[in-house]
């Protein structure tokens, strides 16, 4: 059977290595469409775009709450630092591209361009925080509700500009904690 679902069209540009995105798009396709329409509503009112932006950021972060099996992690045959660097660069790049329609609203509401760019970089910072939290507390085949609460709380705090710096500093510490934790799963590839 070669039945094609509607979301399959959206999955074609997403590489197989970004399985979190593929799974998340499949599970949240209606919510993603809602975010898209709300962002388009931001053309008329900037506050609607901000609400859609926050909702979209938290929705994409939910893609990273479930940990992959250990064999998927080991199939990459990379060192922990190379694995984590590739994951951060690729996935943050895709997230940055997904947020570009929101940044286009800054051209329409040009008086809010500083807030728009600040929110954009705060979201990227929070996204890196979410990925690093996943691998800092990685256990194969688990789902973390505690991690989702922490990410949501930090996400709301990082919207306030002074707290974005704290999240950035926390990312530095989480990076080394994630490397240390992943080292137990990649011991054969060092």
Give the location of each predicted region.
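Short helix-to-coil transition segments within interhelical loops
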Residues: 74-80
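Hydrophobic alpha-helical transmembrane segments of membrane proteins
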Residues: 1-70, 84-190
């Amino acid at each position: 059977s070669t039945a094609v679902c509607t979301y399959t069209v959206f999955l074609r540009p997403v590489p197989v290595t970004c399985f979190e995105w593929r799974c998340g798009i499949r599970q949240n396709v209606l919510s993603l469409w809602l975010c898209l329409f709300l962002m388009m509503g931001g053309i008329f009112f900037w506050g609607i775009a901000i609400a859609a932006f926050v909702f979209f950021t938290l929705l994409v972060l939910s893609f990273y709450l479930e940990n992959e099996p250990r064999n998927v992690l080991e199939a990459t045959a990379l060192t922990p630092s190379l694995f984590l660097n590739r994951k951060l660069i690729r996935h943050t790049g895709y997230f940055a591209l997904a947020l570009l329609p929101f940044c286009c609203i800054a051209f329409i509401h040009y008086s809010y361009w500083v807030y728009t760019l600040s929110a954009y970089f705060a979201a990227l910072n929070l996204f890196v925080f979410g990925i690093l939290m996943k691998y800092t507390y990685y256990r194969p085949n688990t789902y973390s509700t505690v991690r989702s609460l922490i990410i949501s709380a930090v996400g709301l705090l990082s919207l306030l500009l002074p707290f974005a710096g704290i999240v950035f500093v926390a990312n530095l510490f989480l990076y080394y904690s994630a490397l240390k934790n992943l080292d137990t799963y990649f011991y054969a590839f060092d």
